[in-house]
């Protein structure tokens, strides 16, 4: 993109963008929730659509002059529905968190009981963490994973659900490397008379490509981010049955948000069109292949993988046998140009600020064009610096050499 005007108008921000672009080009990006959008998506986000206020929904706005942005929002909604075979879509949530809170606001009253996945077992802040508004306004009870297998014990979920009789069950995760059985969650929800919401933010791209069970076939409400594996702009969306459409739309506007971000909604539309292409399916297939290969290679280097491996785009590493915390591993890897995030592991003895693990994912490196052979190199980089932190210069050179093979925004 051309930043000639910005360079003159605001040299400080121009410099931030240049340095961040350099960092992205020169680093191996392994944060599972990050990706690299196309230039077409960025162009839509940087367009004149940012100037337009459009409170309301297409055809029912509170401002005049919305004829063109209505087209953009309709395209985004229609493409998203086609992508996931859904009856209704709301593309206005500014984030995945807003999408989740929007569903809660639509169907719950303060104090209602909800069953969600424990944050330290792979859930998300908005699934009832006590530090989040979800855990403050609603009575969240959590389920987790088995202590030995690190898999969801659906019979335990059923037992808890029958005990507490929640109004809503939330499925989905931010750090769970295995496939989730949405059909079983539907059966449990029906058994106790609960709504079922699935947060598919992390796996949306895999679902769109037909590589993971589609939660829209089972859930009353499905929320997602539009970035991560979906490779769109930062934002959120809600999919639901047509019978819930009005209550969901009302919960987002005027319930939770005011004016939608029309430039971002246009960028969402662009990314959804990209996701409907055959190339996108091939990309998602490679994401999974890369994650599986990276996991195998890390295991061969003595790393412990939570649940023993992965079915999706991410890996959760238990670093206790390496005598390093997640916090220190994140810092050490960052020093050589590998970006990961510290992450709690199930039944973690460390605090969330320290952690015993790191979460890594393959969406961003796959977007750059990396394949299985490159995962062998990445595993060597991670293994070498964790086991031999004194070899920082050598490993930094390995990172530089790998990144130079795969151009980014050039």
Curated annotation (Swiss-Prot):
Q: Which EC class is this protein assigned?
A: transferase
**Which cofactors, by name?**
pyridoxal 5'-phosphate
Biological processes annotated in GO: glycine biosynthetic process from serine; tetrahydrofolate interconversion
Of the GO CC terms on this record, one is: cytosol
N6-(pyridoxal phosphate)lysine modification sites are: 228
Pfam family of the protein (one): SHMT
- What is the documented function of this protein? Catalyzes the reversible interconversion of serine and glycine with tetrahydrofolate (THF) serving as the one-carbon carrier. This reaction serves as the major source of one-carbon groups required for the biosynthesis of purines, thymidylate, methionine, and other important biomolecules. Also exhibits THF-independent aldolase activity toward beta-hydroxyamino acids, producing glycine and aldehydes, via a retro-aldol mechanism.
Q: What is this protein called?
A: Serine hydroxymethyltransferase
Species this chain originates from: Alkaliphilus oremlandii (strain OhILAs)
């Amino acid at each position: 993109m051309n930043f000639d005007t910005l360079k003159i108008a605001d040299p400080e921000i121009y410099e931030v963008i240049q340095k961040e672009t350099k960092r992205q080009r020169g680093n191996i990006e392994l944060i599972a929730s990050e990706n690299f959008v196309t230039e077409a998506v960025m162009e839509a986000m940087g367009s004149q659509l940012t100037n337009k206020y459009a409170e309301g929904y297409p055809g029912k706005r509170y401002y005049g002059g919305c004829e063109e942005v209505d087209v953009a929002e309709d395209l985004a909604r229609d493409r998203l529905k086609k992508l996931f075979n859904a009856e209704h879509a709301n593309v206005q949530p500014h984030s995945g968190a807003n999408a989740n809170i929007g569903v809660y606001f639509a169907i719950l009253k303060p104090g209602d009981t909800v069953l969600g996945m424990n944050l330290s077992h792979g859930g998300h802040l908005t699934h009832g963490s006590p530090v989040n508004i979800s855990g403050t306004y609603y009575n969240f009870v959590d389920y987790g994973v088995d202590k030995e297998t690190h898999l969801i014990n659906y019979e335990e979920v059923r037992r808890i659900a029958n005990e507490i009789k929640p109004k809503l069950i939330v499925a989905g995760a931010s750090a769970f490397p295995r496939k989730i059985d949405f059909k079983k969650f539907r059966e449990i929800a029906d058994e106790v008379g609960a709504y079922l919401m699935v947060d598919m933010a992390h796996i949306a791209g895999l679902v769109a490509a037909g590589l993971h069970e589609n939660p829209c076939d089972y859930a009353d409400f499905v929320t997602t981010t539009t970035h991560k594996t979906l490779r769109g702009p930062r934002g959120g969306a809600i999919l639901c049955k047509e019978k819930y459409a009005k209550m969901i739309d009302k919960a987002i506007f005027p319930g939770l948000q005011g004016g939608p971000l029309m430039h971002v909604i246009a960028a969402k539309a662009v990314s959804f069109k990209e996701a409907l292409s055959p190339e996108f399916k091939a990309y998602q297939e490679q994401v999974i292949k890369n994650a599986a290969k990276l996991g195998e290679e890390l295991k061969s280097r003595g790393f412990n993988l939570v649940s023993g491996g992965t079915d999706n785009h991410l890996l959760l590493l238990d670093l206790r046998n390496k005598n390093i915390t997640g916090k220190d591993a994140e810092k050490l890897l960052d020093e050589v140009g590998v970006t990961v995030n510290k992450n709690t592991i199930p039944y973690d003895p460390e605090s969330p600020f320290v952690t015993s693990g790191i979460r890594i994912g393959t969406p961003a490196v796959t977007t750059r064009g990396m394949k299985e052979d490159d995962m062998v190199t990445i595993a060597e980089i991670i293994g070498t610096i964790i086991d031999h932190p004194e070899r920082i210069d050598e490993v930094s050179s390995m990172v530089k050499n790998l990144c130079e093979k795969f151009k980014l925004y050039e």
